[in-house]
Curated annotation (Swiss-Prot):
Zn(2+) 2 binds at E157, D191, H228, E273. It comes from Streptomyces coelicolor (strain ATCC BAA-471 / A3(2) / M145). Binds 3 Zn(2+) ions. GO terms for molecular function: deoxyribonuclease IV (phage-T4-induced) activity; DNA binding; DNA-(apurinic or apyrimidinic site) endonuclease activity; phosphoric diester hydrolase activity; zinc ion binding. It is an enzyme of class 3 (hydrolase). It catalyses: Endonucleolytic cleavage to 5'-phosphooligonucleotide end-products. Keywords: DNA damage, DNA repair, Endonuclease, Hydrolase, Metal-binding, Nuclease, Zinc. The keyword Transport does not apply. PANTHER family: APURINIC-APYRIMIDINIC ENDONUCLEASE, ENDONUCLEASE IV ENDODEOXYRIBONUCLEASE IV. Transmembrane segments: none annotated. HAMAP family: Nfo. It comes from the Bacteria. This is Probable endonuclease 4.
Length: 294
C-alpha cells in the first residue's frame, strides 16, 4: 500500500487492486493491499452474490478510513452483482434499491470515494427506454440522498454486452446519464475488459484513445473516476466477461500504456480484477506501474 503523505505526491494514476476483506476491512484488506504494493483499493461491503446488508465493524471501519487517509490511498466499494434497476421483477428492483443504498452508506462510513454498480439489463423482453425510465424512478432518489460532502460518487460500470444490457458501448452511457439528469454525484467506472468485449477494439496505435474520446464526448469531462484494468481472455466484440492478467490477453500491454497518457485519465486510479492469487495480483500491479512510469 502506498505510504504517500499527501495527494500532491500521488502518481498520475494510482494502481491497486480489489482486495479480500473477510476477517476485517483493515486487518485483512489493507494487509493484502500492502503485499500488492497497492496505491488504491476496492472492496466489497456485502456478499457480492447476495442481498444481505450487513452492518460494518466500527473499529475496522475507522482503522480502514484512517489508514487510507494517512497513506493517500483512494478507496472504492463495488456493489453486489445482483443489483439490476432494469429488472421486470418488482422484488429484484426493491432489493436493488436497498442493496445500493447500503453500499453507498457503507462507502461513506469507510471513506470510499466511489461506489461501483453495474448498469444492468432490460429483462422480460422490454424495450430499453422502458427500463431506463424505471432506472430513473428508483436510482435518482438514491443519488439525491448523497448530500454530505464525504458521500461517495455513484460510478456506473458498463457490461460486456451480454443479453439485453442497458449499457455496454461508450455511447450507451448517454441515455443512462440523461435518465439520471447527469446528476453531479454520477460518474463512470470504465472496465477495459468489458468495453473491449462489447466491441471497442482497444488495440492498435489509437484504439484506446479513440474509445476514451468517445466516452468524454458522451458523458463530458470529469466523469471518468475509476478504471477497472483487466485484460480479456476473448477477442474484441465477443460479449464475454472473462478477465485475464495484464498483457496475457487479447488487449495486450500497449493499450494500458496508452490509457495512462490520455487527458481523461489524469488522476484516475486503476484497480485490477484479474485472475489468480496474491502473487498474480502483485505482478499485475507491478506491470501496470511499469507501463505508467516508463
Amino acid at each position: 500500500m502506498s505510504t504517500a503523505s499527501s495527494s500532491s505526491s500521488l502518481p498520475r494514476n494510482p494502481v491497486g487492486g480489489h482486495v479480500p476483506v473477510a476477517g476485517g476491512l483493515h486487518s485483512v484488506g489493507l494487509s493484502y493491499a500492502r503485499e500488492l504494493k497497492a496505491e488504491a483499493v476496492q472492496v466489497f461491503v456485502a456478499n457480492p452474490r447476495g442481498w444481505a446488508t450487513p452492518a460494518g465493524n466500527p473499529k475496522q471501519d475507522e482503522a480502514f478510513r484512517e489508514a487510507c487517509a494517512a497513506g493517500s490511498v483512494p478507496a472504492y466499494v463495488h456493489a453486489p452483482y445482483l443489483i439490476n434497476f432494469g429488472s421486470h421483477t418488482g422484488a429484484t428492483v426493491e432489493r436493488s434499491v436497498e442493496s445500493l443504498r447500503h453500499s453507498l452508506r457503507r462507502g461513506r462510513a469507510i471513506g470510499a470515494l466511489g461506489v461501483v454498480v453495474h448498469t444492468g439489463s432490460a429483462t422480460g423482453g422490454r424495450e430499453r427506454p422502458v427500463a431506463l425510465k424505471q432506472v430513473r424512478e428508483h436510482m435518482l432518489p438514491l443519488l439525491d440522498e448523497l448530500t454530505h460532502d464525504d458521500d461517495p460518487y455513484l460510478l456506473l460500470e458498463s457490461t460486456a454486452g451480454q443479453g439485453a444490457s442497458l449499457c455496454s458501448r461508450t455511447w450507451d452511457f448517454g441515455p443512462y446519464f440523461e435518465a439520471l439528469d447527469a446528476h453531479p454525484k454520477l460518474g463512470v467506472c470504465l472496465d477495459t475488459c468489458h468495453i473491449f468485449a462489447a466491441g471497442h477494439d482497444l488495440t492498435g496505435p489509437s484504439g484506446m484513445h479513440q474509445t476514451l474520446d468517445l466516452l468524454v464526448d458522451t458523458v463530458g469531462e470529469g466523469r471518468l473516476r475509476l478504471i477497472h484494468a483487466n485484460d480479456s481472455k476473448d477477442v474484441a466484440g465477443a460479449h464475454k466477461d472473462r478477465h485475464e492478467n495484464i498483457g496475457a490477453g487479447h488487449i495486450g500491454e500497449d493499450p494500458f500504456r496508452a490509457l495512462m497518457t490520455h487527458p481523461a485519465t489524469d488522476g484516475v486510479p486503476l484497480v485490477i480484477e484479474t485472475p489468480g492469487g496474491k502473487e498474480g495480483h502483485a505482478a499485475d500491479v507491478a506491470r501496470l506501474k511499469k507501463l505508467r512510469d516508463g
